[in-house]
Every structure is written in C-alpha cells, then in structure tokens.
C-alpha cells in the first residue's frame, strides 16, 4: 500500500473544528437556555442555529439578539453535525462568546460571503477589543516605568 493511502483522512470541516476549540476554551454556550442567558447578559457574540432546527428555535434565536450588537446566523450543518463537533448527540442552537473565534468560525464556513454583514460587525468588534488590550498594556507599562 502506498504512503498516501495510509495517511489519507476524510475531509474535515474547519468550521466545526473551531466549534470544538471554542468548547475546550470555554467560549461556547450550548442549548437554548444557556444561549438565552448569554445573549441577555451581552456575552454572546454570535448565535448559531443548525439548518434542521425548528422554526421556533430560529425565531427564539433572533429574538435573543434583537436590538443588540450580537449576530445570529443559520448554518448549512445539521444538528447531528454540530453535536458531533462539540461532543453531544445533537445541538440545535449555540453561542460563541469570543468575537475573534466567532469571526474565524464564519470565515471557515463554506460560502463565507453569505455572512458578510456578520463578519464585518465581528471584525470591527474584535479590532476594538485588540485596541483596548494594547491601551491597557501601555497603561500598565506607564504605571510601572513612567510615561516616555
């Protein structure tokens, strides 16, 4: 058997890998109640709904983010695929709480141009957070060393 046949693996969806990483990092809320509480607390950056989730779930997800700066998208993945990515049976709704992770997730989806509005909003938010981190780091350095 040739080497490439031994090393061949089925294609992996990078977007689902980002969900797995977010779960391990603690930046993911799974299920309707945790997503709702994260959205009400303004912690959810991106609310994600599976393609085969019920219309009621989709309406609830949209109502969670209505009037806020949070984004809501419907994915081309099924509940089973989302569940397998995060280590559950099925997941119909989830929320990413980290804007950089949410942006990387949207960019990894097939046909990311579909989610251009959400990507622009998340990009703006992640840039603002990075700027605040740089300013805080400079402030701490100035407190310690004196302003130059």
Where are these regions (language model features)?
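N-terminal first-folded block
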Residues: 14-49
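Short, compositionally biased "basic patch" segments
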Residues: 1-16
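C-terminal structural segments of small proteins and small subunits
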Residues: 88-124
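A short, gly/pro- and small-residue-rich
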Residues: 57-71
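Charge-patterned, long linear interaction tracts outside catalytic cores
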Residues: 122-148
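Gly/Ser/Thr-rich loops at beta-strand to alpha-helix junctions
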Residues: 52-55, 101
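Mid-chain, well-packed structural core segment of small domains
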Residues: 68-98
């Amino acid at each position: 058997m040739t080497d490439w046949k031994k090393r061949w693996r089925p294609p992996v969806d990078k977007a689902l890998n980002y969900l797995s990483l977010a779960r391990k990092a603690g930046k993911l809320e799974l299920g309707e109640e945790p997503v709702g509480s994260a959205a009400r607390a303004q912690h959810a950056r991106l609310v994600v709904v599976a393609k085969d989730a019920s219309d009621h779930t989709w309406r609830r997800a949209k109502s969670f983010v209505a009037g806020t700066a949070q984004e809501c998208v419907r994915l081309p993945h099924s509940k089973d695929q989302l569940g397998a990515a995060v280590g559950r049976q099925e997941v119909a709704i989830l929320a990413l709480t980290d804007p950089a992770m949410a942006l990387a997730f949207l960019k990894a989806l097939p046909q990311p141009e579909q989610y251009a509005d959400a990507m622009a909003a998340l990009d703006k938010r992640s840039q603002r957070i990075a700027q605040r981190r740089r300013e805080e780091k400079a402030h701490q350095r100035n407190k310690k060393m004196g302003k130059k």
